[in-house]
A protein has these predicted regions:
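A short, compositionally biased
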Residues: 36-38, 224-231, 269-271
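Local cysteine-cluster metal-coordination motifs and their immediate loop/turn environment
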Residues: 121, 255, 259-286, 294-309
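Short hydrophobic/aromatic patches at helix-to-coil boundaries
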Residues: 313-316
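FNR/FR-type flavoprotein reductase catalytic core
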Residues: 80-236, 243
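Ferredoxin-reductase
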Residues: 2-91, 95, 105, 142-145
């Protein structure tokens, strides 16, 4: 099966903030695939890799198109710079939509949290909940006024169900207060940096929200406290040893070595690339594993996590 079967042509581009742009694409030679809130596509990059971007359900978007929101990051490994260099008429290849962050079925209320560019799947969730007529509250947090993308669209979608928070003033997000004010039986959704996700998860569990009602998607891998260094990965099945460079992920190193690896998000939040650790000490940077699982060092997400030891022996 082709990895990037969709051919997308850039129809329009808009600057949502100085660092965030929205892109609207037409699908060349075929119909727009069906998708639901929380879904993403993977856009192929010129270097042979790809990057996931959440699909946007923007108000008044014409039928037959797909929209993305992209943050330009100074520390980007190529994806955001490439996406910000696109112009109307350019063509890219992309995967079919995949959804690892779906809305719950049924009419239970939803409490939505978004941080920074993590608003992209949350905006689509708000649009879907509004269309269903189901109750929700959206808390959108950023560093300072002027830095939050898609505010006019969110106001059109959410009306009074939208709360805006800035770290720089008295509107700063109080997660515990937001949870206390939530409707009974709410599902909790959060997308943003790892710190925000962990804070919402911890507060929700403390409040007694069942784990199966807490849903999240990471929009930035955890930042290492010191520069990364190379290490080795040994495959248990064959004994093959692969060196992972300081600027590579384990998945990238395995692919360079000619190995076929199953993965999706490359952010440490979907669990598809999880594998067992036979020996060595992982440097966990995901948001999937519990604290207890991380301490056990028996599992790791090889899309983002690295090694504290010189070699890892993996159950691959």
């Amino acid at each position: 099966m082709e990895t990037h079967p969709l051919t997308l042509k850039v129809l329009s581009i808009a600057a949502e903030t100085p660092h965030v742009r929205s892109l609207v694409f037409g699908v060349e030679g075929g119909a727009v695939p069906d998708w639901q809130a929380g879904a993403h596509i993977r856009v192929a990059l010129p270097n042979g890799g790809d990057r996931p971007y959440s699909l946007l359900a923007l108000p008044e978007l014409p039928a037959g198109v797909l929209a993305l929101g992209v943050l330009r990051e100074a520390a980007s490994t190529g994806g955001s710079h490439y996406m910000h260099a696109l112009r109307a008429g350019d063509v890219v290849k992309a995967s079919a939509p995949v959804n690892n962050f779906p809305l719950h079925a049924g009419a239970a209320p939803a409490l939505l949290f978004a941080g920074g560019i993590g608003i992209t799947p949350i905006l689509s969730m708000a649009a879907e909940l509004s269309a269903r007529g189901h109750p929700f509250r959206l808390h959108y947090a950023g560093r300072a006024p002027g830095g939050l993308a898609f505010l006019p669209q969110l106001q059109a979608i959410c009306g009074r169900s939208l709360s805006i928070h800035y770290d720089s003033d008295e509107s700063r997000l109080d997660i515990a207060a937001a949870l206390a004010a939530a409707a009974l039986g709410s599902h909790v959704y959060v997308c943003g940096p790892a710190g925000m996700i962990e804070a919402v998860k911890a507060a929700a569990l403390t409040k007694g929200v069942p784990p199966d009602r807490i849903h999240f998607e990471l929009f930035r891998a955890e930042t290492p406290s010191s520069p990364d260094r190379p290490f080795e990965v040994e495959l248990r099945s064959t004994g093959q040893v692969v060196t992972v460079a300081a600027d590579q992920t384990i998945i990238q190193a395995l692919e360079v070595a000619g190995l076929d690896v199953l993965y999706d998000c490359q952010r440490g939040d979907c669990g598809i690339c999880q594998c067992g650790v036979i020996a060595g000490v992982p440097d966990h940077r995901d948001v999937i594993l519990s604290d207890e699982e991380k301490r056990s060092n028996k599992l790791m997400q090889i899309c983002v996590s690295r090694a504290k030891s010189d070699r890892l022996v993996l159950d691959l």
